[in-house]
Amino acid sequence: MKQTLDYIDDNRVNVIYQIPLAEIVFDFFDKLKSSTRGYASFDYDMSEYRRSQLVKMDILLNGDKVDALSFIVHKEFAYERGKIIVEKLKKIIPRQQFEVPIQAAIGQKIVARSDIKALRKNVLAKCYGGDVSRKRKLLEKQKAGKKRMKAIGSVEVPQEAFLSVLSMDEDAKK
């Protein structure tokens, strides 16, 4: 919400806004610097606390909650932020031997989901031609092994994943 707009001289403007602190944390500084090519600066003061509808968003990797990726977001923007973060994490987290679901959840409700596909070895490479039942047996054996790995496997989260949660730029939507 804009409060004042003062022209200091021909090249400088002083604009005073009231913005929620959460919006400043999520990529405001980077957007300000990139849109002004580094010329703008900002200073902030805490004006007051206001009641708002906030929710805690948890990020689940392979069904396990990652506390370091949890954050508080306004209820109105929860779906969009969850979708952006899930897509970013899908690009950053390396593929595993098993399929890894990435979910954004508010309480028990899943608001966004994406899957990292599993790496697969071509088990049919040594089967030339013929027997369909042999091929099916090999694929079923691989499927059972992947299911077993998924049950006991854990996912390593790279360091840049934690930093990417804080930057909400538009390239995640592409």
From Swiss-Prot:
Required for accurate and efficient protein synthesis under certain stress conditions. May act as a fidelity factor of the translation reaction, by catalyzing a one-codon backward translocation of tRNAs on improperly translocated ribosomes. Back-translocation proceeds from a post-translocation (POST) complex to a pre-translocation (PRE) complex, thus giving elongation factor G a second chance to translocate the tRNAs correctly. Binds to ribosomes in a GTP-dependent manner. The lineage of its organism: Bacteria, Bacillati, Bacillota, Bacilli, Lactobacillales. The keyword Cell membrane applies. It catalyses: GTP + H2O = GDP + phosphate + H(+). GO terms for biological process: positive regulation of translation; translation. This is Putative elongation factor 4. Belongs to the GTP-binding elongation factor family. LepA subfamily. Its main location: membrane.
